[in-house]
C-alpha cells in the first residue's frame, strides 16, 4: 500500500542526499548540487504532504520504539542513552513508525579496574 510506496521513495531520497553531499564536496559541481537540492525539496514536500514526519534524534533520549542503536560511544559529557549521532534518518507516517532512525548513543565511560588486569602468578 501507501506505506510500502513511501518506504521505497525514502530509499530514493537517501540516494539523492548521498549524491548531494558528494556534489557539495566536488569542485565545480555547484550546479549539480543546486539541482539535487531542488529535487530533494520537492520529494520532501510531497512526502510531508502524505503525512511523513522525520523523527528528531540527535540530542534526544534513545527510544527503542523509534531508534535502532548501531554503536555505543563512551561519553561522560551527556546523560546515558543520549543520541550523539544519526546514521540514517527515521520517519513516521501519520503517527506510525515507517522506518526507525539508526543512531549512535552515549554510554558512561567505564574506567579500567585492577580486576581487569591479568593476575601474575609469581612463577616463571
Where are these regions (language model features)?
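Charge-rich, N-proximal long alpha-helical rod segments
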Residues: 1-11
Amino acid at each position: 500500500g501507501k506505506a510500502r510506496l513511501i518506504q521505497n521513495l525514502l530509499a530514493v531520497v537517501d540516494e539523492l542526499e548521498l549524491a548531494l553531499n558528494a556534489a557539495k564536496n566536488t569542485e565545480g559541481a555547484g550546479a549539480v548540487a543546486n539541482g539535487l537540492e531542488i529535487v530533494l525539496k520537492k520529494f520532501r514536500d510531497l512526502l510531508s504532504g502524505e503525512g511523513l514526519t522525520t523523527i528528531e534524534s540527535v540530542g534526544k533520549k534513545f527510544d527503542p520504539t523509534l531508534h535502532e542503536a548501531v554503536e555505543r560511544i563512551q561519553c561522560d559529557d551527556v546523560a546515558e542513552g543520549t543520541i550523539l549521532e544519526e546514521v540514517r534518518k527515521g520517519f513516521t507516517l501519520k503517527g506510525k513508525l515507517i522506518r526507525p532512525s539508526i543512531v549512535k548513543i552515549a554510554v558512561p565511560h567505564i574506567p579500567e579496574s585492577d580486576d581487569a588486569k591479568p593476575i601474575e602468578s609469581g612463577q616463571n
